[in-house]
Swiss-Prot record:
This is Cell division activator CedA. Belongs to the CedA family. One of its GO terms (molecular function) is DNA binding. The keyword Ion transport does not apply. Keywords: Cell cycle, Cell division, DNA-binding. The keyword Metal-binding does not apply. It comes from the Bacteria.
Length: 80
């Protein structure tokens, strides 16, 4: 009998965005993307939620970071 590939009752770990007052000083804004900044060679999205920014995990491509930001906006229905 073969073993199942993944553990059945394992909890799914989801990313909880860090809250920051602003993107860090050394982050470089990517002009072609609304929420994407370059940080230590990776792409990070910062989405303004009320008084603070939510920070995405680091991505290797800016499109992924922007997609994350769009999803966060949709989930929280942020209106401009």
């Amino acid at each position: 009998m073969k073993k199942p590939l993944r553990q059945q009752n394992r909890q799914i770990i989801s990313y909880v965005p860090r809250t920051e007052p602003a993107p860090p000083e050394h982050a470089i804004k990517m002009d072609s993307f609304r929420d994407v900044w370059m940080l230590r060679g990776k792409y990070v999205a910062f989405v303004l939620m009320g008084e603070s920014f939510l920070r995405s995990p680091a991505f290797t491509v800016p499109e992924s970071a922007q997609r994350w930001a769009n999803q966060i906006r949709q989930e929280n229905e942020v209106e401009e």
